[in-house]
Amino acid sequence: MSESGHSQPGLYGIERRRRWKEPGPGGPQNLSGPGGRERDYIAPWERERRDGSEETSTAVMQKTPIILSKPPAERSKQPPPPAAPAAPPAPAPLEKPIVLMKPREEGKGPAATTSTSTPEGTAPPPPAAPVPPKGEKEGQRPTQPVYQIQNRGMGTAAPAAMDPVVGQAKLLPPERMKHSIKLVDDQMNWCDSAIEYLLDQTDVLVVGVLGLQGTGKSMVMSLLSANTPEEDQRAYVFRAQSAEMKERGGNQTSGIDFFITQERIVFLDTQPILSPSILDHLINNDRKLPPEYNLPHTYVEMQSLQIAAFLFTVCHVVIVVQDWFTDLSLYRFLQTAEMVKPSTPSPSHESSSSSGSEEGAEYYPHLVFLQNKARREDFCPRKLRQMHLMIDQLMAHSHLRYKGTLSMLQCNVFPGLPPDFLDSEVNLFLMPFMDSETESETPPRAGPGSSPLFSLLPGYRGHPSFQSLVSKLRSQVMSMARPQLSHTILTEKNWFHYAARIWDGVKKSSALAEYSRLLA
């Protein structure tokens, strides 16, 4: 190579191999200066950069290696080389590649062509660019994490274009029930149709009801679940006793009915316990009894005990409805059902230790006594204290949680009474006649000597309105604690399978079989 830096004709022949063997001066050499070996290495790369332009001058070829060999800091300070102005006067056949290169040069100038080609060149990648991929990776560093975060936030289905119908189906609320369905039929057989309305979530409250015939169990459960007092009783989710059924002395509900609300609260309505109409149906229709029962009344009582023991095992709250105060046989029946109740593990160590050491590993639900069709004198504070005291004495030896979870004093039903008015407050709630609500709304006629102002005032009822009491009862029942029914946390579907096993175990219970033999 000559002193001017131009290559000799024999540069790539025998002379080049001979020059490699010639000893040179020791120490570092300037590879970027004229006469260095970098000049021989860069020449092929320059020929690739001249693919878009055939008329580039020799001076440009000499300056290009100098720009690439300098550090990046000095390269950015150096004025742009005159290679950019030579790009527009390109031949007609190469006009299209030059148009693709123009957007890259408008970003940061000609010197930043390789570094700025990534954001705009990713969609249409250039066909002939073997060297710029290194620059493209460097240019993508500030923008690549943005795309990765977006893909990660949208989940696994984001790149695959999720079906909008599937996405909307996941956001839709669960199917709403319009009426109750059978959980246990009149033949005391388990039904599996209720599982279609259940979900795989654990925040569920199960409320059951017990009571004698004609006390208003179905009406109370309908008002607590989905209906209002203003609606027609024929549209209730739990069908109430019709006037014809009342005249015949029959029962409306048979077996156990199931209903679940949008708030994921399960309501279980049951047939009347110790029902005379069921006993009359068994006797008059010559229905065959199971072989283990000899007498019809024994079979009716065992059916009632099975239902009560089942509710004491699978429910968080059990409401005992009665329409007069009080029937001692009802409390005796509750104690018997507690005795034959299936043994279940304690929900947690804390609850078993706090509820008492005598409970052991047993689970017991909250028990609420609902005095339906209460009269005006039942709301008298003195009568209220007597009812609480009597229930507390009758249930003194019970392990059921019959006190401490519901209070009429705290929900402002008796605003003039102090919170400590009742010495032993049990879970007792009073509900007046629903028919008396419309009768009391009609203003009484003013007498001949009375002021016309009193004719505009409503009549004295001695208690809040029926609708107000229903809303207070609903809020207190729905706010009760929801302890675990078994040693594991149950979802709605798991609760259904658990309840099916409990019902099968209750029907095959040895304790119930032994008790039926004692009755015979």
From Swiss-Prot:
The keyword Phosphoprotein applies. The modification Phosphoserine is found at S2, S4, S7, S32, S53, S451. Residues 109-121 have a biased composition (Low complexity). GO terms for biological process: brain development; eye development; heart development; nuclear-transcribed mRNA catabolic process, nonsense-mediated decay. The modification N-acetylserine is found at S2. InterPro entries: P-loop_NTPase, SMG9. The keyword Metal-binding does not apply. Phosphorylated by SMG1. Residues 1-143 are annotated as: Disordered. Residues 78-94, 122-133 have a biased composition (Pro residues). Keywords: Acetylation, Nonsense-mediated mRNA decay, Phosphoprotein. Residues 36-53 have a biased composition (Basic and acidic residues). Involved in nonsense-mediated decay (NMD) of mRNAs containing premature stop codons. Is recruited by release factors to stalled ribosomes together with SMG1 and SMG8 (forming the SMG1C protein kinase complex) and, in the SMG1C complex, is required for the efficient association between SMG1 and SMG8. Plays a role in brain, heart, and eye development. Self-associates to form homodimers and forms heterodimers with SMG8; these assembly forms may represent SMG1C intermediate forms. Component of the SMG1C complex composed of SMG1, SMG8 and SMG9. Self-associates to form homodimers and forms heterodimers with SMG8; these assembly forms may represent SMG1C intermediate forms. Interacts with DHX34; the interaction is RNA-independent. Belongs to the SMG9 family. This is Nonsense-mediated mRNA decay factor SMG9. It comes from Bos taurus. The gene is SMG9.
